[in-house]
Curated annotation (Swiss-Prot):
Belongs to the bacterial ribosomal protein bL27 family. It comes from Chelativorans sp. (strain BNC1). It holds the Pfam family Ribosomal_L27. This is Large ribosomal subunit protein bL27. The gene is rpmA. GO terms for biological process: translation. Disulfide bonds: none annotated. InterPro entries: Ribosomal_bL27, Ribosomal_bL27_CS. HAMAP family: Ribosomal_bL27. The lineage of its organism: Bacteria, Pseudomonadati, Pseudomonadota, Alphaproteobacteria, Hyphomicrobiales.
Length: 89
């Protein structure tokens, strides 16, 4: 018996929802404690000073300050938060 498969439109046409990964706060940008700096899968960026890492590898600020990125000799990129020192009144 001759069978002909359908055009394919009913079998295709699905896609996963985007995960909105990437850098949320860039170098020099001010952050508050708890602000998400980077959403990532795995450790493309590593936590530096005043930065914590969640169980899904999200990097977040532990302290208010300015975000900075630094590449170390081991080839890893570290994200740090430099606290903004306010003048004593």
């Amino acid at each position: 018996m001759a069978h002909k498969k359908a055009g394919g439109s009913s079998r295709n046409g699905r896609d996963s929802e985007s995960k909105r990964l990437g850098v949320k706060k860039f170098g020099g940008e001010a952050v508050l404690a708890g602000n998400i700096i980077i959403r990532q899968r795995g450790t493309k960026w590593h936590p530096g000073a005043n930065v914590g890492m969640g169980k899904d590898h999200t990097l977040f600020a532990l302290q208010a300050g300015a975000v900075s990125f630094a590449k170390k000799a081991n080839g890893r990129t570290y994200v740090s938060v430099n606290p903004i020192l306010e003048a004593a009144e």
